[in-house]
């Protein structure tokens, strides 16, 4: 029998023969190693487990293995809360889910969970520690959650006061600030504008030229379509007109002449009517009908009576007359 550091009996059959002896030899090699690991991990009988304020010791302890039991995990969280009291007090019960019906008024009244010096033992039994924020540094700065909770009621109060002060204006001030919703037709100024007749646009008076002036302008235009400045001034002075009147008359005359020329060109470009030679069938000196043939409508010889079934209806139409007309050219 071999006993390890913890006085744990380890049964090892060390007989060298057979497969059982080989397995026993392997177990004999593993027993000292496992025993040394267990001896290093087991705490001393009188020592307090991880109840230290040294942060490095807490970090070292966090790297060790933890038994997979709910009670061990909860104890580990409580130990970390004792190790870092500042972080434990920063966790607000108002941030966690409440499973035992803790009132919202108490959570708002004490957002930080009591005095700053209170430890994890002072936490109410109503909130679940597993539903708190993560322990890996997601809490943020201490006191931020409490400050936000305090600021929310203050902001609500400030908004309520602003809403109360806004409608505090008197009815006169509101009436003065709001424009009159009445339509513009009711305004007296608008009524006056509607009653007044619309102002007609003042037409520019056309210059009335005398026959002598028009004759002289046309003669000069046929001779010279464009006038220079001195020539225009000389012509205006001789006709007792202004230079602007002479200038406008020449412009209008050039425009009319151009339009007439374009119309003439279009008519000239149109294809002329084609003349077709027609054979003359009737001449002026030839007589078409004889005096006795006017009563008879047909001049062609009749071959048989059945070609003309209605010959009996004609007055004076007989076979003898038809036979006589057969010999006419």
From Swiss-Prot:
Q: Which coarse location class describes where this protein primarily resides?
A: nucleus
What UniProt keywords are attached to this protein's entry?
A: Developmental protein, DNA-binding, Homeobox, Nucleus
Annotated GO CC locations: nucleus
Which Cys-Cys disulfides exist here?
none
Q: Which Pfam families match?
A: Homeodomain (PF00046)
Gene Ontology MF terms in the entry = DNA binding; DNA-binding transcription factor activity, RNA polymerase II-specific; RNA polymerase II cis-regulatory region sequence-specific DNA binding
Biased composition of type Basic and acidic residues is found at 138-160
| Superkingdom of origin organism | Eukaryota
Upregulation: By foxf1-B.
Which residue intervals are the DNA-binding region?
202-261
UniProt key word Isomerase: no
Alphabetized PROSITE patterns for the sequence: HOMEOBOX_1, HOMEOBOX_2
Q: Where is the composition biased (Gly residues)?
A: 110-124
State the compartments where it is located.
Nucleus
| GO BP term, pick one | cell differentiation
Distribution of this protein across tissues and organs:
First expressed in developing facial cartilage in early tailbud embryos, with expression localized to the basihyobranchial, palatoquadrate and possibly Meckel's cartilages. Shortly after, a second area of expression is seen in the musculature of the anterior gut. During late embryogenesis, gut expression extends into hindgut tissues. In adults, expressed at a high level in the kidney, pancreas, spleen and stomach and at a slightly lower level in the intestine, skeletal muscle and tongue. Adult heart, liver and lung show little or no expression.
- Annotated region Disordered: the residues are 107-188
Instruction: Indicate the family of this protein.
Output: Belongs to the NK-3 homeobox family.
Q: What protein am I looking at?
A: Homeobox protein Nkx-3.2
The UniProt gene name for this protein comes to: nkx3-2
